[in-house]
Amino acid sequence: EWGHNFRPDYLKLPNYRKELNIPLVLLLTATATKKVKKDMAAKFSILPEHIVQTGFYRQNLDLSILAVPTKAKNQQLIESINEQSGCGIVYVTLQQSAEYVANFLSQQGLSVQPYHAGFMSEKRQEIQEDFMSGKVQIIVATIAFGMGIDKANIRFVIHYDLPKSIENYSQEIGRAGRDSLPSNCITLANLDGLNTVENFVFGDTPELSGIDLVIKNIQQECQNHKWELQGLSLSNASNIRQLPMRTLLVQLELQGVIKPLFSYFADFKYKFTTTKDEVLDPFEGERKEFLATIFKYSGFKKVWGEPDFDALFQHYGCDRGRVIVALEYLQEKQLITLETKKITEVYSVNKTLLSSPTLARSLHEYFVDKEEKEIKRIATLVRFFELDTCLSHNLSRYFDDQNAPVNCGHCSVCRGKEVKLNYSQDVIWPDDIRIFEVLTSLIEHMSTKNKSVISLETMCRFLTGLTVPLFSRNKVKQLAGFGSCENIRYQEVREKVIRIMNL
């Protein structure tokens, strides 16, 4: 399962190894199941006798699963933190939850900062450095926090929300106690957030129609066996989020349909840091004439100018590459400020493989298979939290470590406190008539945007409040009913929509 949608480009590493004829490879991971280990070994031609497992069990980590209703979570969080010493991490699912929980803890007088992918990279770096130095004691974070974090004295990790899988759970608690001193890993668990983690999965599965559109785009835009891609525009057109779009492209690569060649920036704009004459003064002859021509055939809006590459080729015979080199040279000499955007990736295309009538369906089946496996992993996580035998032992066995003690003595189950997870309150549905009305309104709205057919998945994503390119582009989130079933599991919403809309 490694690579899919997390680091899809990882899936290409075995091919790179073969292409570059690399004789030896070393794969390192802390959280691979037996099946994943075999899969990785097979892809990299690693023999079974060359697989080494050093053990997963960590006796200094105390694992506790607490069944806590949503309304009681904040109080339990404070109580749990007050019982700890030193610094720690509180993991949440959503960006807004990170800020909400951090604000709550700050009001209680704790040294805390939120951290999530919505922050600018400079701010994330500053928060991380403050935590590493001890200036900040607690980080409330989404899974965006953790990669590359190696702070030895993290004394506690608390999951305020459900993790996404046993793999995620183990990676996140694995950041505690790296100095081998006792550390506590606490999960405040109920089933209220189950729909949220499941919806992340459902929202990333492309529809067959979207995959088919991508294939048709390659067929129509391919010239001389080359295809140029601007990721955001194709993502919008196909209604496929950018991360699964990247996964789709990787799968097309692995099947030999496309092969990456190079990339370039489609749009350039520049502004002078001095006068135009002072920019031209250091140059003579043809070089000066060439630069003057670039400036002449640049469309300026106030201070920024965009070179017209077609006009430059027509009037001066220069190709795009020479213009870019000249602009980059001027920027290096601090004579202009140059900005680039719209990175364009260029692929070679195997038209024979691209024309396979089963290509789109096979790719869609791949994504659906991954979706089903991800949902099963979430269910496995819930079952793990509800176990009545040692958590440490079962966690180690999950990762193929058969040598962990049967009863660790430092988990909530070994202390006789096994749990049964429940919903904090009954799920409240909008009535069927209301669902029919808001979906009818969605269909009417999209018909004005030249979208005559609204799929079942589009309706379900609308009701559950999932953001997809189609909604952002057509202002769908402003419609009444968007997210009206956001607290309900996606599969249940799908069944309801099929019945109400007679699909």
Predicted regions and their residues:
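Accessory DNA-binding and partner-docking regions appended to nucleic-acid-acting proteins
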Residues: 211-217, 221-383, 388-503
